[in-house]
Amino acid sequence: MRLVTLAPAKVNLVLRVGPVRADGYHDLRTLMVPLDLGDRVDVRVSARPGPVRCTVPGRPELDGPENLAARAAEAFRRRFGVDRAVSIRIEKRTPVTAGLGGGSSDAAAVLRCLARALRVRDGAALAALALEIGSDVPFFLGPGPAWAAGRGERLSRAEVPPLDLVLVYPADPSLAIRAGDAYRWLDEARASGSQAPRRLGRPGRWRPTLLGNDLQAPCVARKPALQALLGLLVGAGATAAIMSGSGPTVFGIFPGRGAARGAALAIQGRAKGGAAGVQVLLARTVRRHPRVSPWRSPRSASSRSTRRSSRPT
């Protein structure tokens, strides 16, 4: 069986970080929303035994068993006693290590495809498996925008209206941020007294005044260029701009699709004029994760379109 789906990117509209726990993780309260931007994940499940293979065309450094999507497939096979060969192909559109959840979303997409192909309906077991793979993976198995608590495993549905965004990803390697570093910098800032701990609060109805990210200040302190990118977004008309997750991607919220498109073009023009090494992406939040669909060849898709267009109206 061959299945395809979109693995959506996400942004954190709210990210509040509690103190470090005994297990080394932090308690979180975060509002995550999926985007209409993401990777295309193609999963083939053979009827015969065999290995897991994962390829990312154009990104050979992401091929192989260390890709989180491949690790998700291996974990699924172990958990549910499956030995069938699995082939994964990812068309990468979400920037890597960007605070947009690309790898976690790919992993969740693989779990959803395998669950459908092999008729696994144990949602609790899938959710537990997702958390073993990564803290953000359970969110991408969920229904859509959600408040996440704990490590990210306690999810509650959130109502978020469609938001038009411009994302700016600094491709300069010197601005890359590892998630572990971002949390460590926050712990150090709090220990020194330069950043006071926040109360996590309770999930509530989304409103723009909630927008915020506890990791932003310590990351900007170490990577001042991020502040300039936030300034680009505000200067282009964003009503607000923050860093997503552990960064380094920043995003701005705009009053409509037209305003966002104009801002993206303006920021791209600035990038060509000197702010080199940035990727500018236009996106909109969505209210549910994409469905898993059977794979169809481009030829069969075009023939269906031709048949539809030839019908009398």
From Swiss-Prot:
Pathway: Isoprenoid biosynthesis; isopentenyl diphosphate biosynthesis via DXP pathway; isopentenyl diphosphate from 1-deoxy-D-xylulose 5-phosphate: step 3/6. SUPFAM superfamilies: GHMP Kinase, C-terminal domain (SSF55060), Ribosomal protein S5 domain 2-like (SSF54211). It catalyses: 4-CDP-2-C-methyl-D-erythritol + ATP = 4-CDP-2-C-methyl-D-erythritol 2-phosphate + ADP + H(+). The active site is at K10, D136. GO terms for biological process: isopentenyl diphosphate biosynthetic process, methylerythritol 4-phosphate pathway; terpenoid biosynthetic process. It comes from the Bacteria. GO terms for molecular function: 4-(cytidine 5'-diphospho)-2-C-methyl-D-erythritol kinase activity; ATP binding. Residues 292-304 have a biased composition (Low complexity). InterPro entries: GHMP_kinase_C_dom (IPR013750), GHMP_kinase_C_sf (IPR036554), GHMP_kinase_N_dom (IPR006204), IspE (IPR004424), Ribosomal_Su5_D2-typ_SF (IPR020568), Ribsml_uS5_D2-typ_fold_subgr (IPR014721). It is an enzyme of class 2 (transferase). ATP binds at P95, V96, T97, A98, G99, L100, G101, G102, G103, S104, S105. Pfam families: GHMP_kinases_C, GHMP_kinases_N. Its EC number is 2.7.1.148. Coiled coil: none annotated. Keywords: ATP-binding, Isoprene biosynthesis, Kinase, Nucleotide-binding, Transferase. The keyword Kinase applies. Residues 289-313 are annotated as: Disordered. Catalyzes the phosphorylation of the position 2 hydroxy group of 4-diphosphocytidyl-2C-methyl-D-erythritol. Belongs to the GHMP kinase family. IspE subfamily. This is 4-diphosphocytidyl-2-C-methyl-D-erythritol kinase. It comes from Anaeromyxobacter sp. (strain K). The lineage of its organism: Bacteria, Pseudomonadati, Myxococcota, Myxococcia, Myxococcales.
